[in-house]
Amino acid sequence: MSALSRWLLIPPVSARLSERYQGYRRHGASPFSAALGCLWTILAWIVFPLEHPRWQRIRDGHKALYPHINAARPRPLDPARYLIQTLWLVMISSTKERHEPRWRSFARLKDVRGRYHQWMDTLPERVRQKTTHLEKEKELGHLSNGARRFILGVIVTFSLILALICITQPFNPLSQFIFLLLLWGVALLVRRMPGRFSALMLIVLSLTVSCRYIWWRYTSTLNWDDPVSLVCGLILLFAETYAWIVLVLGYFQVVWPLNRQPVPLPKEMSQWPTVDIFVPTYNEDLNVVKNTIYASLGIDWPKDKLNIWILDDGGRESFRHFARHVGVHYIARTTHEHAKAGNINNALKHAKGEFVAIFDCDHVPTRSFLQMTMGWFLKEKQLAMMQTPHHFFSPDPFERNLGRFRKTPNEGTLFYGLVQDGNDMWDATFFCGSCAVIRRKPLDEIGGIAVETVTEDAHTSLRLHRRGYTSAYMRIPQAAGLATESLSAHIGQRIRWARGMVQIFRLDNPLFGKGLKLAQRLCYLNAMFHFLSGIPRLIFLTAPLAFLLLHAYIIYAPALMIALFVIPHMVHASLTNSKIQGKYRHSFWSEIYETVLAWYIAPPTLVALINPHKGKFNVTAKGGLVEEKYVDWVISRPYIFLVLLNLLGVAAGVWRYYYGPENETLTVIVSLVWVFYNLVILGGAVAVSVESKQVRRAHRVEIAMPGAIAREDGHLFSCTVHDFSDGGLGIKINGQAQVLEGQKVNLLLKRGQQEYVFPTQVVRVTGNEVGLQLMPLTTKQHIDFVQCTFARADTWALWQDSFPEDKPLESLLDILKLGFRGYRHLAEFAPPSVKVIFRSLTALIAWIVSFIPRRPERQAAIQPSDRVMAQAQQ
């Protein structure tokens, strides 16, 4: 390069060009790219007057106007990138100038939109105020009960007839489109309206569209002339029918959540009943169990009416010694049949309380647990069971591996936040094995905890309901525990739940037998159907491959009609679920959860349907560590297989697009879009299988709690506790931190009007942020510390309202990012031979993306970018 430039150019220009070449090389450009960059520079100086002030201003704004082009490290096709970006800048600049006045009119539309939203937000309250006088009046009050029931029956009958006509009426494409526009317009009108009316209206609209879709699928979309297409189409129709049934049952289940509130206890404590607290354990570490016992000892309940029992199925001497030391009862079985259910039933022979509260050994109850739950038992004598949420202060594998802890609702939030509350409306609340209180008399009547299935909790509540007893659910978290530490343990737990619910379906089917109301039967049925999602989910993940690989028409209809039926069905269901479930499950996350579990719950549920007695009980491990970040290749193997299968479908789809019949082009495009969506979801499943490092034995809990620290010299400083664990705390001193690392200080915390002192040592000081490690505590101090932290009545209730509002489009974008993240992890942890393929694909995608124009960075707005571009056009 140097010799050639000296031969062709005068010395000053040659030296300048050589200096530029060396600069390119220092910034990482290859010799070819550096030489080509110099050549493009020469041509640019020849063609354009780059020394002119106008061009100098453009060059000064290079980073803002051309953010994706590195001028210090040229690439061979940079001129093409400059050309595309310049045309883009000219286009958006002229568009902005042309449409600037119109935005003022759009501001008026925005103002009208804001007023409409305000009007809709206040509509329910205005209607309530206008109709208050009607609450005491009954339009049909002069009629007998029989006449009123007859009129209601006539109304329901005519409504069903109209609904049937609406669902089954065939439309041509234009009529179907207009019908959908009307429904969509109504949905957009009511979706922002607060209160339950809007949710009910959205459910009606969603059911209308979905029922029309399923009717159309059964009557118009099966190819009876092609056996392969017929078989594949029936398989997909089976999965869609399952999804439709779950959708309908789900709407019924949560249509009117009860939101039960506590009932005050009698002021006279002598009327309070006796309670036994059971803490069953098998192979958990003693440190996991201690906090639960310490919290139980501090529950606000008369000590002579409270007995705490450690039910140790491991028969460990350390647990016996601990129980004796803290003053609680200890029971160890000589035989271990029926696992946890047998352990509890054995303890029932020894305990004599009127009620029994059950906590898993890692679930730490709050001090208010019994005061919040027991009032309902005294009010309703037929109430047999009160369930509270299972709240977790540690992230589950989805939250930890994806970095979403306390950013999006976790997998269980929907069940404990909405579904159980909806069940409560229909008197169908399930016993969940922990964080619950059961009345002894009904429990003894059914022979104790059910032992016939591995989900003894749900089966027990089913038996109680069959006996005519009621159940209740209170959505306020009154205990918190440890989530599963690894994805494999999480999947193992879900396998047990799935198999157990299917066992109940086979052995004690809620649809049959006496004692249950129709609503209870439907709620139990939906719970069992939920765990049968494995096979339908796998069908959805592979369905488009039937056409791409086998040329089978799984939906035998024109692409236009498919779009007019499928898209509204999905959009209305998503919109309705976002309205109903938004606080508890963000849009599209169910796809990730079900995909991760599908492969693993499909075989055991299928086996349980055939042979419900096959299989064994497994205990979910808690409190483990993940020493290093790694991909669980065993768990992720099915996802990778499905990814490869879908990539094969992409290749087949590309071939069909270019070489297949022209009349199938739209069908190929629709199938490829479906495949790409499946690949995104599978990428998310792969991302979950990358186990993040977890080296803390004691999980930190975020909180905002006032406190104080006292130095040994007597100086006192107020502070705010922002996190705590079983071994230490993080605090923020209100003012300048006047403590040193290694210094011993006392931490002062309040519970009610009582103040407690805990010895600590400073282990970290960063500004006014201080890390404290607890010094060895006495048993009394440890109990007090748990009472001031884990067992505070308000610790967990504040977490429920901390999640952001669900926005379906933003949630979809999160899922897309998550899918790409999964493939990036595959490239990161793959064997060297596979890494080459991933790196090549990544490089190819990055090269293609580098040509896409970008919006100018914000710095360009500081300079008059429109004027600069106008100068470039001159």
UniProtKB/Swiss-Prot annotation:
Task: List where the protein spans the membrane.
Answer: 30-50, 151-171, 173-193, 230-250, 525-545, 547-567, 592-612, 634-654, 668-688, 833-853
Q: Where in the cell is it found?
A: Cell inner membrane
| Catalysed reaction, written as an equation | [(1->4)-beta-D-glucosyl](n) + UDP-alpha-D-glucose = [(1->4)-beta-D-glucosyl](n+1) + UDP + H(+)
Q: Determine the domain of life of the protein's source.
A: Bacteria
Whether Membrane counts among this entry's keywords is yes
Where do the segments described as Catalytic subdomain B lie? 441-501
Region (Catalytic subdomain A) residue spans: 271-364
Which residues bind substrate per the record? D360, D362
- Give the protein name, as stated in the record: Cellulose synthase catalytic subunit [UDP-forming]
- Report the source organism: Salmonella typhimurium (strain LT2 / SGSC1412 / ATCC 700720)
